[in-house]
Amino acid sequence: MSKFNRIHLVVLDSVGIGAAPDADKFFNAGVADTDSDTLGHISETAGLSVPNMAKIGLGNISRPIPLKTISTEDNPTGYVTKLEEVSLGKDTMTGHWEIMGLNITEPFDTFWNGFPEEILTKIEEFSGRKIIREANKPYSGTAVIDDFGPRQMETGELIVYTSADPVLQIAAHEDIIPVEELYKICEYARSITLERPALLGRIIARPYVGEPGNFTRTANRHDYAVSPFQDTVLNKLADAGVPTYAVGKINDIFNGSGITNDMGHNKSNSHGIDTLIKTLQLPEFTKGFSFTNLVDFDANFGHRRDPEGYRDCLHEFDNRLPEIFANMKEDDLLLITADHGNDPTYAGTDHTREYIPLLAYSASFTGNGLIPQGHFADISATVAENFGVDTAMIGESFLSHLK
């Protein structure tokens, strides 16, 4: 019998809690990640008030320097710790795959200076369309169409760009490059990025519509991902008949592997929380696992090095936690964590190699305190033990500590 009938895992994308022990091996603009501290530096420079997460025990997590504006709780409502990454990477897919029990020893490739000419030329030859070279770099998806959409409407050139993650994205105006044509180009791009030196996690078709100054991305986005190299705990749950619900980009990250119910992409964090709440309310969801990613922290504020915006985004999530609590059952477990860091005060614009926080809450708890410090995969090991399935490659369960 499961200790918790439902477990809900929410990933606050990039909300790290201090440099990892191996941060000296990871860099931003030539600066090692050793002084990175996403939550700490936001708290220090922008001020941070997250009373609902603080009540669970966020301020009680062991740190060299306490979070400046988040106090410790003498009697928290939950259990907390911080977790270290084992895998050799600090991207979204690596973080999520490890959370679900895998150890990634060969990270995906990222292209901070844009894709090499060899890849661009192959795409041009296949598609019969030129590529706008100025867009070939890490770019905000909305900014890149604002900057190059007018040119694409005139010339029919492709907008090919990347991000901090191992992805190749192609944006195309639906009136200029039909969606089906864009899909075929992306399928080809997927076929040439399956091994080093260009092993990419995802190829993303990014259709949009509108006029210059008023472009809008459409719902015709399509991801061409790779599945995890072996079964994760998601697969083990699904194989055992335990329903799994994906909210946000979780389905894309795992290429649908082990997902029994995809609840769709998020338009924003707020929309993602709405979808999570709707998922919690589903009458058929009496037992199982929900997995939510909220990406605005990372995409809108971490990469853009905007600590005030990041702070406000954290405030927004914290303000909505009571709604999530209100839609949980007494025997539900909520786990709040992250997948990597992205310190908005740090050098460069890339992710940062950090510990991630873990907050555990259930209305059924009679105790509280600290969970032993462990690793990302401990989350999936805990989920696995709760539902009586095998773990994946790595991870130690902390289920017995939740009382």
From Swiss-Prot:
The record lists the catalysed reaction(s) as:
2-deoxy-alpha-D-ribose 1-phosphate = 2-deoxy-D-ribose 5-phosphate; alpha-D-ribose 1-phosphate = D-ribose 5-phosphate
This protein's pathway reads: Carbohydrate degradation; 2-deoxy-D-ribose 1-phosphate degradation; D-glyceraldehyde 3-phosphate and acetaldehyde from 2-deoxy-alpha-D-ribose 1-phosphate: step 1/2
For this chain's record, the cofactor binding note is:
Binds 2 manganese ions.
Concerning InterPro entries, the annotation shows: Alkaline_phosphatase_core_sf, DeoB, Metalloenzyme, Phosphopentomutase_DeoB_cap_sf
Query: Which cofactors, if any, are listed as required?
Result: Mn(2+)
A GO-annotated cellular component: cytosol
Q: Does the keyword Manganese apply?
A: yes
* Family annotation (Pfam families): Metalloenzyme
Q: Give the GO molecular function terms.
A: magnesium ion binding; manganese ion binding; phosphopentomutase activity
Q: Where does Mn(2+) 1 bind?
A: D13, D339, H340
Q: What keyword terms does UniProt attach to this protein?
A: Cytoplasm, Isomerase, Manganese, Metal-binding
- One GO BP: nucleotide metabolic process
Could you name the domain of life of the organism this protein comes from? Answer: Bacteria
As for subcellular location, the record says:
Cytoplasm
Name the enzyme group at the top EC level. Answer: isomerase
As for what it does, the entry says: Isomerase that catalyzes the conversion of deoxy-ribose 1-phosphate (dRib-1-P) and ribose 1-phosphate (Rib-1-P) to deoxy-ribose 5-phosphate (dRib-5-P) and ribose 5-phosphate (Rib-5-P), respectively.
Q: Which PANTHER family match?
A: PHOSPHOPENTOMUTASE
Protein family membership:
Belongs to the phosphopentomutase family.
For this entry, the protein name equals Phosphopentomutase
Recall the taxonomic lineage recorded for the source organism: Bacteria, Bacillati, Bacillota, Bacilli, Lactobacillales
